[in-house]
Amino acid sequence: MERILGVNLSGWFIPEPWVTPSLYAATGASNAAELQEAMGTAAYNERMRRHYETFMSEDDFRRMAQIGLNAVRLPVPWYTFGSQESDASYISVVDYIDRAIEWAAKYDIRVLLDLATVPGGQGDSNDSPATPEAVAEWHSSTNGRHVALDVLERLADRYGEAESLLGIELLDTPQMSVHKSLFTMTDGIPAHYLRNFYRDAYELVRSYMPEDKIVVFSSSGHPNEWKHFMRGAKYKNVYMDLHLYHYRDEYALDITSPRGLTTAISRNKRELKEAISTGFPVLVGEWSGAAIFANSSVTPEGRNAYERVFIANQLASFAPAAGWFFQTWKTEKRIAAWDARAALGTLERGMIE
């Protein structure tokens, strides 16, 4: 398969305050559920309908192809096909996914559909500079598993044989519970629950998708936990998704120093090596140019220069991977470290490839 060089299309079907702050203006909301509650169902759905119509266009796909990209990772919500719940109502986004699939085919771009939300939440939402601490209660909800499997099956049924479909990611970055010590576990979804879900989800989507389409699961930040997973002959074209960020928590690094830059790139290489050692082809499903700037005297121009060097070095470190998806294609305020039009658009095509 051709190496995957892509971008995420975050904020299109799942409104993100850091991508499109105008959607949240004067509401006090920080996620889709809060936004709907603040606005009321009818006003919320009308605002989202306008957003779905205008946020992405065919010209975006043309520009992606123009700078050398050949894939998009498209986060979709559990209510992709619409939902009428007692406390909330969501309109379907499938007509807009149809457009993405058609535009992608026109410009020789492949689409990875990524189930990015589930009822109750899957936890580790690590895709933005300002995401609140997420909650993982999906495995405890009464119908969460059924809803997730249902939307995956319907996505595979509708798009499984589409020429431009790269594949389906079964669940975006679930927070997995692992051993913190001999007798204690971290918060999150039990590993056995995720493994069983992934096996069942694989069976469902593969029944609609030919074997050349990939099925992706998240490492959940612990690649070694998956060493002996999905090893039977019936599992075809299964990829692992690894996310690599350097802007917060213990991974926050100052890239204005040579040591900080070297440490970040060494971490990329180390974690990629660990993931690849499991035997799965590995995709860096999310990464960005975001990092820490400890030197307050760095000018905006200087910051852009540091980020450009950081991005170029990260691209080189991803060489062993089967591909990558920058986070994200576009932001309303054109945030340089997170907006591929700024971050990748000025790079020479050879650096991306």
Across the structure, where does each feature detected by a protein language model lie?
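Aromatic-rich peripheral "rim/lid" segments of glycoside hydrolase catalytic domains that contact
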Residues: 299-353
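Glycan-binding loop/region signatures in secreted carbohydrate-active enzymes
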Residues: 4, 9-54, 264-272, 277-284, ...
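Short, loop-centered acidic/histidine patches that primarily coordinate divalent metals
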Residues: 77, 81, 285-288, 329-330
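Extracellular glycoside hydrolase catalytic/binding regions
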Residues: 150, 157-160, 164-167, 171-320
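Short loop/turn segments at secondary-structure transitions that flank enzyme active sites
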Residues: 13-15, 246-248, 330-333, 346
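Conserved residues at the C-terminal ends of beta-strands
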Residues: 10, 75, 171, 243, ...
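Conserved beta-strand termini and adjacent loop/short-helix elements that scaffold enzyme active sites
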Residues: 114, 218, 243, 327-329
